[in-house]
Amino acid sequence: MLKEIRPALVMLVALTALTGLVYPLAMTGVAQLLLPAQANGSLIEQNGQVIGSALIGQAFTDARYFHGRPSATTAPDPQDSSKTVPSPYNAANSMGANLGPTSAALKERLTADVDAAKQDNPTSPVPVDLVTSSASGLDPDISPEAALFQVPRVAKARGIDEAKLRALIDSQIQGRELGLLGEPRVNVLKLNLALDRMAA
């Protein structure tokens, strides 16, 4: 009987070693050699401290900063572990809202978000990405239109000329990947860091 099982056991051990150890270690080594910043999470540092990742959004709420998309991520409720509470940009619990198009809760949230956005800029249509969360809830980017929509609020809060902010946004626009994939976008963390440098 051992004779019949032995080839299967040898194959199991060999493939486990190959796919569980050799391949991941080889890919990690290649990534560290060719793309070390990306392999380590595209971390962004300021004054020697890691302040975030270019790949994961952050919850900016101060009027002096550009805001990202809403995040639907949650965390366990400290008072009742069977429930959850909102925890924007919680990378440990990446998910969308899972609310359907006929959901009353979704309609209520969208209406409140649109009304809040209109307070900052009542004359322009609200870009959809300022009121809808991404599938992961962690999207670090917004459309150039969403960034431009926020210019009046940021300019007023900082006392900066709107034309300077529009020029700053233009300098931060990332084009389509390979010239055809995705849409032009602005990384909110990088934009806010550039904003702080400009104001300094």
UniProtKB/Swiss-Prot annotation:
Family, per entry: Belongs to the KdpC family.
Keywords annotated in UniProt: ATP-binding, Cell inner membrane, Cell membrane, Ion transport, Membrane, Nucleotide-binding, Potassium, Potassium transport, Transmembrane, Transmembrane helix, Transport
Primary localization class, coarse: membrane
Native organism: Rhodopseudomonas palustris (strain BisA53)
Region Disordered, residue ranges: 68-97
Subunit comment: The system is composed of three essential subunits: KdpA, KdpB and KdpC.
Family annotation (InterPro entries): KdpC
Membrane topology: Single-pass membrane protein
Subcellular location: Cell inner membrane
GO MF terms held by the record: ATP binding; P-type potassium transmembrane transporter activity
Gene: kdpC
Any one annotated GO CC term: plasma membrane
Protein name (Swiss-Prot/TrEMBL): Potassium-transporting ATPase KdpC subunit
Transmembrane segments: 9-31
Function: Part of the high-affinity ATP-driven potassium transport (or Kdp) system, which catalyzes the hydrolysis of ATP coupled with the electrogenic transport of potassium into the cytoplasm. This subunit acts as a catalytic chaperone that increases the ATP-binding affinity of the ATP-hydrolyzing subunit KdpB by the formation of a transient KdpB/KdpC/ATP ternary complex.
Polar residues composition bias: residue spans: 71-96
Pfam family, one: KdpC
